[in-house]
């Protein structure tokens, strides 16, 4: 079943049926002010932190309520509806709507009772408040009086848990008042006589506002109970039914902002207003609301500026291939998904309620990879930040606080860190993600000076980027298991594998092998011969260990338990085949050609499904070892034989590195949201963003996806497609082009900005090959192979590649 379509000309997804199988959401804002909005205007807002900066309330894991609601009421007939289908929920035979999710904005259009409305939700660039710009048009042949009411439900405390759970406290600290064109909410209002800089138990007055611009306020309400009324809900609030609000504030209940204006519309006439929401002191709120009196002009300009900003970032890499699904994901939605995970990590969505008050180390370092080719200047700032969250022993802080203070942080070795973050120990893989991320940034930009930039460690000391990477090697070397391979510690990438200080992870061993390959390149550049020799010797030892211990006839095992038990050997009754060791044996370069092809074939034969490759098989049930925490999940779910979507990016890349274009693209299309637009009732998640996992073949809901938007899938699939399928593989001194594509792709184009040059790349495939370069021309000059040295680049570089 289909609920909408992609409009690539505007880079929008257009929802034509509002009764989607789940809330389909979009992200608005920036790291300073974030907002999540669904196709029915549900969602919430927060300043900086979804945990400690919550502004608008949202109730998770129930109906998609409350939200950013605008009610319209015909003053003559007293009939009312909402500018989004919900919350009023008029009969869809008479109520028509569209929702356009774009890049950092959402538009909702509705037609009912010969009234057309269009509301545009966005956060202006470089601002920390949101705008609901509403246009109402009278499409009838008679004069109409339309009562318009905007409703925003405030949290009673900026902390999500305090607002939702600690009601004996949070309900008695807020009040609301009316200030001419806005409702002002004050948290801890009774502290308004404190001197500047003073607090009581770390508490001060916090101001929020809900304002109206472009029309006068005819009535208002600052109390949720007063607006909704007893035994009423968001679908039939008393304030809307009556056509007038009670003009009363909140004192010791639940605060809200509700503002009503009555618009008189002649036939064909349109009027615009704007509602504004934010966390600002009252004097600043007054200035903001007054700025939007000419809301039509300013809102148009702000929205256009926002579109140009995001489309500008996306324009740095665009493709035109025979696959529309591939094009829309790479050009727009996978790219935008990468930016959202880059900004919000796993801090705030409809699944992540905001309790993770910081950046996960491994998550964030991987997320950076997805935007390096689009916004290297943004990427390097986050790389610096994450390097400064590396402990001086080489490990990463499992959770990096939003208030991170480099050089002064506690670590998992300190009880205070464990108590504050809930993370009791280091993870084996965290710092190893730095190697490909730093390498990709330097290779994309050619900024080799970055390797010598000095950055502090999280707790104490400082060092160059090169030194940070060496410390990461030290961390792995200092945490080896019984056989001499890297220990799994509290977790490797798979949080459901608790291997401890003696158990060993093949996945981490392959990561470590790859890390040493990368660091050898940096050591060569630095002419650090002594350290280069150390890496060569260490890598050879590790390679022998992996080959001797981990290759099991036709697959790489997953590792060893603390008791030395093998995980993932052919004879195991459960979990005898694992996805990630096979893909990473290829990505790391450790597997020989025969092993690589045999391992990948086994993945395809034993793990692949129509929705992607499952993480392992068979699922755990009766034979899980003590550290196999995946057994807590239902079969076919998450780490217990679910289709863990992040791993799809790695299998795409692995197949592409082997030149298997058909197989690489097949893995992409199986798990691509856009390719499931016509099966929305099965997938349920948005058809324009990735989810964390899809239920596997052992689930009765095979194909249903979960945990939208904020997932490492966005970056791994982007890397798998850009570096793998499209073959864009820069290094320190230029760009290698090595596509691995479906045979039927006779021609495709890539537009890529690279080191100050705009590359227009045309790939021709008359022989229907999957991979291989016959000849490469750069500005008409034939290269000796498929590599473009940097000195061959011009301001506009025309590239023509023939596959063979």
Regions found by a protein language model. Give the residues of each.
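Anionic coordination/interaction segments
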Residues: 1-362, 376-385, 389, 440-444, ...
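Carbohydrate-active enzyme catalytic cores, enriched for enzymes
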Residues: 2-17, 22-23, 541-544, 548-612, ...
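Aromatic-rich carbohydrate-recognition surfaces in CAZymes
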Residues: 71, 359-364, 368-379, 383-483, ...
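Hydrophobic, small-residue-rich alpha-helical packing segments that form membrane-like cores
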Residues: 104-106, 499-514
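Catalytic cores of carbohydrate-active enzymes
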Residues: 151, 165-166, 397-398, 513-630, ...
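Extended, well-ordered alpha-helical scaffold segments
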Residues: 287-295, 301, 305, 329, ...
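Carbohydrate-binding/catalytic loop surfaces
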Residues: 349-358, 398-427, 458-464, 483-505, ...
């Amino acid at each position: 079943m289909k609920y909408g379509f992609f409009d690539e000309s505007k880079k929008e997804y257009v929802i034509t049926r509002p009764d989607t199988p789940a809330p389909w959401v979009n992200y608005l804002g920036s790291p300073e002010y974030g907002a999540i909005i669904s196709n029915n205007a549900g969602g919430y807002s927060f300043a900086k932190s979804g945990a400690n900066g919550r502004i608008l309330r949202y109730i998770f894991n129930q109906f998609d309520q409350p939200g950013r609601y605008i009610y319209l009421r015909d003053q003559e007939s007293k009939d009312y509806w909402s500018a989004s289908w919900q919350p009023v929920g008029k009969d869809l035979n008479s109520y028509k709507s569209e929702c356009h999710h774009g890049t950092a904005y959402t538009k909702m259009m509705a037609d009912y009772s010969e009234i057309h409305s269009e509301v545009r939700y966005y956060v202006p660039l470089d601002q920390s408040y949101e705008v609901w710009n509403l246009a109402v048009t009278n499409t009838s042949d008679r004069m109409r009086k339309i009562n318009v009411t905007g409703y925003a439900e405030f949290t009673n405390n900026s902390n999500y848990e305090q607002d939702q759970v600690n009601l004996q406290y949070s309900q008695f600290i807020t009040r609301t008042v009316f200030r001419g064109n806005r409702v002002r909410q004050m948290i801890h209002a009774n502290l308004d006589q404190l001197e500047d800089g003073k607090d009581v138990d770390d508490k001060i007055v916090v101001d929020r506002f809900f304002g109206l611009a472009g029309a006068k306020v005819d009535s208002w309400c600052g109390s949720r109970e007063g607006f909704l009324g007893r035994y009423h809900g968001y679908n039939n609030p008393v304030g809307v039914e009556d056509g007038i609000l009670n003009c009363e504030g909140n004192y010791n209940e639940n605060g809200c902002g509700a503002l009503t204006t009555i618009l008189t519309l002649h036939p064909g006439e349109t009027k615009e207003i704007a509602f504004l929401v934010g966390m600002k002191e009252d004097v600043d709120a007054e200035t903001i609301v007054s700025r939007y009196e000419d809301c039509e002009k300013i809102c148009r300009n702000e929205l256009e500026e926002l579109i140009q900003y995001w489309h500008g970032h996306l324009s740095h890499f665009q493709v035109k291939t025979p696959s529309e699904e591939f094009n829309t994901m790479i050009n727009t939605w996978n790219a935008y998904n990468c930016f959202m995970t880059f900004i919000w990590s796993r801090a705030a969505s409809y699944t992540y309620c905001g309790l993770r008050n910081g950046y996960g180390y491994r998550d964030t370092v991987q997320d950076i990879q997805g935007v390096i080719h689009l916004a290297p200047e943004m990427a390097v700032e986050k790389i610096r930040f994450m390097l400064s969250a590396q402990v001086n022993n080489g490990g990463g802080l499992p959770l990096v606080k939003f208030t991170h203070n480099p050089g002064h942080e506690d670590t998992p070795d300190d009880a205070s860190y464990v108590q504050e973050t809930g993370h009791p120990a280091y993870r084996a893989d965290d710092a190893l993600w730095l190697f490909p991320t730093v390498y990709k940034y330097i290779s994309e930009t050619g900024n080799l000076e970055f390797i010598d930039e000095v950055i502090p460690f999280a707790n104490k000391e400082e060092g160059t980027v090169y030194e940070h990477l060496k410390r990461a090697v030290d961390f792995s070397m200092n945490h080896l298991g019984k056989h001499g391979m890297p220990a799994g510690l509290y977790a490797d990438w798979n949080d459901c594998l608790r291997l401890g200080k003696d158990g060993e992870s093949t996945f981490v061993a392959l990561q470590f092998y790859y890390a040493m390959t990368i660091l050898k390149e940096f050591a060569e550049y630095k002419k650090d011969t002594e350290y280069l020799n150390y890496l060569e010797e260490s890598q050879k030892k590790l390679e022998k260990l992996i080959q001797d211990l981990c290759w099991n006839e036709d697959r790489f095992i997953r590792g060893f338990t603390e008791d030395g038990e093998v995980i993932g050997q052919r004879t195991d009754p459960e979990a005898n085949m694992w996805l990630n060791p096979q893909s990473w044996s290829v990505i790391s370069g450790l597997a020989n050609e025969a092993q690589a092809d045999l391992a990948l074939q086994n993945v395809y034969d034993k793990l692949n499904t129509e929705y992607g490759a499952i993480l392992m098989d068979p699922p755990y049930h009766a034979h899980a070892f003590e550290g196999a925490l995946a057994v807590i999940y239902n079969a076919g779910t998450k780490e217990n034989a679910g289709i863990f979507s992040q791993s799809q990016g790695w299998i795409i890349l692995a197949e592409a590195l082997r030149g298997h274009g058909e197989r690489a693209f097949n893995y992409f299309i199986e798990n691509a949201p856009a390719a499931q637009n016509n099966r929305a009732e099965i997938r349920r998640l948005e058809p324009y963003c990735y989810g964390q996992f899809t239920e596997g073949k052992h689930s009765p809901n095979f194909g249903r996806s979960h945990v939208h938007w904020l997932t490492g899938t966005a970056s791994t699939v982007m890397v798998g497609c850009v570096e793998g399928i499209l073959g864009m593989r820069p290094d320190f001194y230029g760009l290698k082009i090595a596509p691995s594509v479906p045979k039927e792709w006779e021609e495709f184009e890539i537009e890529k900005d690279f080191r100050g040059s705009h590359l227009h790349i045309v790939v021709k495939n008359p022989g229907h090959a999957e991979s291989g370069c016959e000849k490469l021309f750069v500005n008409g000059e034939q290269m000796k192979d498929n590599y473009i040295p940097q000195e061959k680049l011009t301001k506009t570089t025309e590239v023509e590649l023939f596959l063979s």
